[in-house]
């Protein structure tokens, strides 16, 4: 490591130490006498870490739980991540896989119009909305 790179690394280490200690002290009660020890401990811990060596890792693409063709059934949709069956996939993706529908479609190379709701469920909700009169203009009150 060159001297300037080493100096920059040391500056970064001191800056990170200061940020971590400041964040800790702002949320915890620390006696003034223990502050130097805390700073030293954090600095030592950070000094012990190093940048990971670049290792060529052969990462296999994750395989879907079921085939994309079989994932959409009339009464349910199968999650390609875990294999679970759902009427609506959006909430499951958000809560269990921390993914948006767009990220899910991108990960599995799905078309933009890939459904997030089972076809029968969508039809039932549509029918219910029409029966309730949703989507129609209100009658003028005179």
From Swiss-Prot:
The processes (GO biological process) annotated in the record are: regulation of DNA-templated transcription
- Which protein is depicted? Transcriptional regulatory protein ros
**Which Gene3D superfamilies does UniProt cross-reference here?**
ROS/MUCR transcriptional regulator protein
- InterPro entries referenced in this protein's UniProt entry, alphabetically: ROS/MUCR_sf, ROS_MUCR
Query: Which stretches are zinc fingers (C2H3-type)?
Result: 79-97
Q: What does this protein do?
A: Specifically represses the virC and virD operons in the virulence region of the Ti plasmid.
**What superkingdom does the record give?**
Bacteria
Q: Name one GO molecular function term.
A: DNA binding
Any Pfam family hit: ROS_MUCR
Q: Which family does it belong to?
A: Belongs to the ros/MucR family.
Organism, scientific name: Rhizobium radiobacter (Agrobacterium tumefaciens)
**What UniProt keywords apply to this chain's record, in alphabetical order?**
DNA-binding, Metal-binding, Repressor, Transcription, Transcription regulation, Zinc, Zinc-finger
């Amino acid at each position: 490591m060159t001297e300037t790179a080493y100096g920059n690394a040391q500056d970064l280490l001191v800056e990170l130490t200061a940020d971590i200690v400041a964040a800790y002290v702002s949320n915890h009660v620390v006696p003034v006498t223990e502050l130097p020890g805390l700073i030293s401990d954090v600095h030592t811990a950070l000094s012990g870490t190093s940048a990971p060596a670049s290792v060529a890792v052969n990462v296999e693409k994750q395989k879907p739980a079921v085939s994309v063709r079989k994932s959409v059934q009339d009464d349910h949709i199968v999650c390609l991540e875990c294999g679970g069956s759902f009427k609506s996939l959006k909430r499951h993706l958000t809560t269990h896989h921390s993914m948006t529908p767009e990220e899910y479609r991108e990960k599995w190379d799905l078309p933009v119009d890939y459904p997030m709701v089972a076809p029968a469920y969508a039809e039932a909700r549509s029918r219910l909305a029409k029966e309730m009169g949703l989507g129609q203009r209100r009658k003028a009150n005179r």
